[in-house]
C-alpha cells in the first residue's frame, strides 16, 4: 500500500505543484489504484509515473470545485484508449454524475467500460468488501465536501508451524487444514484444533484523505488512529483568519487534528502557491512543532504505508 501524490497545489496549477490528486496504490492488495480527486492535468502527471489508467478502479471526489474535478473527463476518456475495459466507479457529492455525463455527451466521448456513480449526501459507508471498507463524513467547506477513511481488513494470523513441528507433526496437507482452522485427527489418534495454532490476526492499515475544510470534529473522527492522514494545509499558522474566511486550514490546525486523532503520520497537501522553497519548509516546521511526524508532500512523492509491526 502506497500513497502517490499527483498534485499537491491549491486553486490552480502552478510551476511547482499541480492541482489536487492523490493515488492510493493497492497493487499488491487488489491489483488496483484508487484516485482521490482529479484536478486539471492529472493525466499528464500520471504520464510521469508508473501508474496505469487501466488499473484505476475507483475515483473518490471530495468536492466539486474545479481544482479537484476538471481532470476527470480527460482521464476517463484516456482510460478507454489505454486498454481500460473493467468497470470504474466514481464516488462524490451530488452533481458529479451530471458533470461527467455532460462533459462526455457534449464532447461525443464513448467509453469502452461501464462507468458507475455513487453520489453522497451524508456520512455513510460508500464501499465495503472482504478486504477494504471506505467511509465518508462531511467536512466544513464552502460547498458540500467530504473526507474519506479507507480501512483495510485485518490479515489472518499465520500458522505457528514451529509449534506443530515440536509436536512431531510433519508438514504436508494437514498444515493447510490446520491453517484453515479445522480440527484434524492424526494417524496416531491425536486430535489437533487448528485454531489453537494460529497466531493473532495482523491489524490492517487505515488511510484518511480529507478534502478542503476548516477545523471540524469530523476530521478527527475520520482520522482516528490512522496510519496516515492526508490533510490540506493551504495557509501558514499566521493566516488563521484568512483560512477561516476561505474555508481552509492552516499548517498548525492540520497538525492539531493529527495530534488529537492519534495518527502515525501527517501528510500536508493543497499548498498555496505563495509557499515555495523555504516557505514550504516553514509550513512543515510549523506543523512539526505541534505534531512531530508531519511532512509537506510534493508532486510525485510516494509514501509507503507498511503493515503495523507484529507484537
Swiss-Prot record:
CDD domains to which the protein is assigned, alphabetical: RNaseZ_ZiPD-like_MBL-fold (cd07717)
Pfam families found in the cross-reference section: Lactamase_B (PF00753)
Superkingdom of origin: Bacteria
Single GO molecular function: zinc ion binding
Annotated catalytic residues: 67 (proton acceptor)
UniProt KW keywords: Endonuclease, Hydrolase, Metal-binding, Nuclease, tRNA processing, Zinc
Enzyme Commission number, as recorded: 3.1.26.11
Nuclease listed as a keyword: yes
Residues holding Zn(2+) 1: 63, 65, 141, 212
Positions of Zn(2+) 2 binding: 67-68, 212, 270
Reaction it catalyzes: Endonucleolytic cleavage of RNA, removing extra 3' nucleotides from tRNA precursor, generating 3' termini of tRNAs. A 3'-hydroxy group is left at the tRNA terminus and a 5'-phosphoryl group is left at the trailer molecule
InterPro entries the UniProt entry points to: Metallo-B-lactamas (IPR001279), RibonucZ/Hydroxyglut_hydro (IPR036866), RNase_Z/BN (IPR013471)
Function summary: Zinc phosphodiesterase, which displays some tRNA 3'-processing endonuclease activity. Probably involved in tRNA maturation, by removing a 3'-trailer from precursor tRNA.
Family, per entry: Belongs to the RNase Z family.
Matching NCBIfam families: PRK00055.1-3, RNase_Z
Record-given protein name: Ribonuclease Z
Organism (species): Lactiplantibacillus plantarum (strain ATCC BAA-793 / NCIMB 8826 / WCFS1) (Lactobacillus plantarum)
Organism lineage: Bacteria, Bacillati, Bacillota, Bacilli, Lactobacillales
